[in-house]
Amino acid sequence: MIIVTGGAGFIGSNIVKALNDKGITDILVVDNLKDGTKFVNLVDLDIADYMDKEDFLIQIMAGEEFGDVEAIFHEGACSSTTEWDGKYMMDNNYQYSKELLHYCLEREIPFLYASSAATYGGRTSDFIESREYEKPLNVYGYSKFLFDEYVRQILPEANSQIVGFRYFNVYGPREGHKGSMASVAFHLNTQLNNGESPKLFEGSENFKRDFVYVGDVADVNLWFLENGVSGIFNLGTGRAESFQAVADATLAYHKKGQIEYIPFPDKLKGRYQAFTQADLTNLRAAGYDKPFKTVAEGVTEYMAWLNRDA
């Protein structure tokens, strides 16, 4: 069995899909379906069982067994960069991750987990997986950073695989439940389909992010499980492309619309990553050599998926 926490969420459900594509269906999905809309991410997927996150954590802390577990993909977390309840964030993202990590170490179960490019904070260059480059801007980034630091202490002594992925700006299918945290491509598509003008912040041609397609993210996760490499790795494309490029690809697919530029909100000033670009040196050195989709390629594929029933 393979366990996927956050398996009804965005990246988790895409990992479940990638496993299904390889013929793997003996999957336990762990999630919190209080937001009932997330079930749609699993409707077309095949899993063996579902468990609520709280029940799962109780069983993990009690040391209960789940049968022959081949790996745990730990994608479950509070991923809101605008959430400032630090206790909630640390309980959800840090303590929970530590409990799972030790459960896996004791049983030598491969543990693959979601870190984040938010660990780098507001820097504009040298996105390198090393302490001197890390300075998170929000409590979400701090919770991810602190767990990475914890993992670094344990890695040299670990007898089983531990791998963390610093996800950059992930976009693609199965993110509709994320609301304001969904990607720009998702929001632009929704606005166009509602007959509204698609909106970007003023200066969006200057805001550049490393936008990585979720299908590529899932492929990297599965490659690492198959190859047993440990460490903390950036997971982006290695390219910085503008929000304007995302909009251009969206409009090109729809063949209509004109961007409306809106003022940049005061509440985000100083807490907003204006530039991200993954340094893929360590990922490539680990042996992962597949190309990553460009924004034009990924957004076009995503638009086709979003509008498949149109």
UniProtKB/Swiss-Prot annotation:
Keywords: Acetylation, Carbohydrate metabolism, Isomerase, NADP. NADP(+) binds at residues 10-11, 31-32, 38, 53, 75-79, 92, 144, 170, 178. One of its GO terms (molecular function) is NADP binding. Its EC number is 5.1.3.20. Binds 1 NADP(+) per subunit. NCBIfam families: heptose_epim, PRK11150.1. This is ADP-L-glycero-D-manno-heptose-6-epimerase.
